[in-house]
């Protein structure tokens, strides 16, 4: 962004955005939107409205402890592997899982790495920055491809819709997409 916001390379901060999106804790499509755009402003308003709609003031209460579970963490590891995300998350994700009472081991990362394709090469793993990744389909593409291949658990709960399948239906993903267009 070359200003306020996270860096344009795919480091820990942008990997966090990817994780929140693939775990269903962002609004659909929210990761990597430029911080000073009209779209970011619209997402901020929509996020506030969604937070209110799933709070105690509604009949659809979704506290984070009831939203994320083992499926969410497996999806997170697969997302991290498929996007070449920050290796810092090999420490952060097991700690987050432990805080939720879930055991996530490095061996789980190893096992999942054997079945998960690398779908994006964003700097420092390639020449494209995060803005180019987002413009080429970004998380919509990644989530759609991984769901189509049966690598993500689409029944995982999200803050939007009932599950990850509902979540992706809000995005502009159509399959099959040409993988050549994604950095």
What residue ranges belong to the model's regions?
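Single conserved hydrophobic/aromatic residue that forms the stacking wall/gate
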Residues: 173-183
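Active-site phosphate/pyrophosphate- and oxyanion-stabilizing loops and adjacent acidic/basic residues
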Residues: 17
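Internal gly/pro-rich beta-alpha loop/helix module
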Residues: 3-4
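Accessory "access/gating" subregions that flank catalytic or transport cores
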Residues: 9-11, 20-21, 25-86, 91-125, ...
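Conformational gate/switch positions in structured elements
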Residues: 85-88, 138, 178
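Phosphate/diphosphate-binding loops
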Residues: 113, 120-172
């Amino acid at each position: 962004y070359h200003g306020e916001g996270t860096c344009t390379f795919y480091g820990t901060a942008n990997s966090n955005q990817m994780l929140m999106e693939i775990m269903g804790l962002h609004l659909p499509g929210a990761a990597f939107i430029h911080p000073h755009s009209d779209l970011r402003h619209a997402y901020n308003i929509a996020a506030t409205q969604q937070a209110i709609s799933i709070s105690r003031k509604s009949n659809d209460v979704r506290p984070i402890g009831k939203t994320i579970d083992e499926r969410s963490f497996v999806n997170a590891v697969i997302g991290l592997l498929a996007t070449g995300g920050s290796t810092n998350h090999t420490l952060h994700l097991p700690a987050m899982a432990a805080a939720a009472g879930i055991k996530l081991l490095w061996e789980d990362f190893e096992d999942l790495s054997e079945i998960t394709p690398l779908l994006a090469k964003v700097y420092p793993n390639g020449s494209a920055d995060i803005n180019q990744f987002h413009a080429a389909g970004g998380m919509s593409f990644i989530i759609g491809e991984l769901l189509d291949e049966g690598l993500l658990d689409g029944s995982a709960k999200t803050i939007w819709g009932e599950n990850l399948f509902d979540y992706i239906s809000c995005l502009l993903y159509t399959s099959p997409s040409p993988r050549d267009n994604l950095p």
